[in-house]
Regions:
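Short, Lys/Arg-enriched N-terminal segment that forms or immediately precedes the first helix
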Residues: 25-37
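Short helix-coil-helix linker/hinge
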Residues: 41-44
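Pre-recognition alpha-helix immediately N-terminal to the DNA-recognition helix
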Residues: 46-51
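Short capping segments at the starts of secondary-structure elements
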Residues: 55-60
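A short acidic, leucine-rich amphipathic alpha-helix
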Residues: 63-69, 80
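Short coil turns linking two alpha-helices in DNA-binding domains
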Residues: 76-77
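Basic amphipathic alpha-helical segments that dock to polyanions
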Residues: 80-90
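Non-DNA-binding regulatory cores of transcription-related proteins
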Residues: 88-90, 94-185
Length: 185
């Protein structure tokens, strides 16, 4: 068995990645969501989404390409970029601009209250990005986005997307920094 990382394993070089059960569940829900909205989650799109959902950190396009090549030796950058474009357009993933990387959207298929987020009109997200460990966490604070969208509309601006990226240190990295500081004292 060849391992891509601790969360994704390959049975052989010609097989698709085997994802953990929670990722498989999200992939199945994404496939249903796509079908209900007249879209098709192809096998390549599903694999790229699965790789993104399996990673604890935002995934860059070339990192995704390298992982995809483990199962599809002939995968090329356009293959990954087309899949990423589709996943972005459907709102299943977000692009974190400052990292030039991608994360799964926690609202599109996981909000837990049956919302049709395609009806929102403006895809909105807020991210906390840790400069220590590189992890990104999507916030579920619609009130932040609503205030910004209302302010934009008040001046005649029609928003199409709204993403806020806040960089800092997560709780784990803050504890590590404090421990390192106390060791040096």
């Amino acid at each position: 068995m060849v391992s891509l990382d601790s969360s994704v394993a390959l049975i052989s070089s010609s097989d698709a990645p085997v994802f953990p059960a929670p990722v498989l569940d999200r992939l199945d829900r994404a496939e249903i969501w796509c079908r209900e909205h007249g879209q098709r989650l192809t096998e390549t799109r599903r694999q790229v989404l699965g790789l993104i959902l399996s990673d604890v950190k935002p995934s860059g396009a070339y990192d995704l390409l390298a992982k995809l090549r483990a199962t599809h030796a002939n995968a090329a950058p356009p293959t990954v970029y087309r899949a990423l474009d589709f996943l972005l357009e459907t709102g299943l993933i977000h692009r974190i601009e400052r990292l030039s990387a991608f994360v799964g959207c926690t609202h599109a298929i996981d909000c837990g209250h049956g919302c049709d987020h395609a009806q929102w009109g403006v895809h909105r997200a807020q991210f906390l990005i840790c400069r220590g460990c590189g992890k990104a966490r999507e916030l579920e604070q619609d009130s932040v986005a609503v205030v910004l969208l209302e302010a934009a509309r008040a001046v005649g601006f029609q928003p199409e997307s709204a993403t806020i990226e806040i960089e800092g240190l997560c709780a784990v990295c803050q504890r590590k920094d404090k421990a390192a500081d106390s060791d040096q004292a």
